[in-house]
Amino acid sequence: MPNHLDNQLCFLLYATSKEITRQYTLLLKPYDLTYTGYITLLALEENEQITVKELGQRLFLDSGTLTPLLKKLEAKNYICRERSKEDERLMKIYLTKEGVDVRRKLPEVSRQVMKQSNISEQQFVQLKNVLQNIVYNDWKIKDEN
């Protein structure tokens, strides 16, 4: 098998991620949300009291990306940040009522992206399962930093 780009899993995952993110970005525009803002609201809905560090780990985002994002979401009154009462070094993040309201309007966005992908629901479930296995794999090659 030649070493063409279209035969490289890394390239196909990269290109797919870029296109799906682009589709989400277009569909989220009416809500004044970016893709990372969207997944942040999803993560906060799953975890009602989460620290900034935990949120960054959950979303695979570093603090340099996460902090400005949280400031934007806070300015829109979608989230609030508070110091933990147990440990003041920790900052906890919560969805506000407005954040919950906008989040409840968004399931249709995911359905539209899936529909536009031209894959069946069964293929979607299979792909999601394969990708979860890859993402949550205990990788043998570790970053030494």
Q: Language-model features: where?
A:
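Short, Lys/Arg-enriched, disordered terminal segments
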Residues: 1-6, 122, 126-129, 135-145
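Short, structured helix-loop boundary elements
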Residues: 6, 10, 34, 63, ...
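N-terminal helix-turn-helix DNA-binding core of bacterial DNA-binding proteins
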Residues: 22-65
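N-terminal leader segment of winged-helix/HTH proteins
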Residues: 1-31
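Short, locally clustered residues in the helix-turn-helix/winged-helix DNA-binding domain
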Residues: 14, 42-46, 107
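Charged, amphipathic alpha-helical coiled-coil/dimerization segments
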Residues: 71-129
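Alpha-helical linker/hinge and terminal dimerization helices associated
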Residues: 16, 20-23, 59, 102, ...
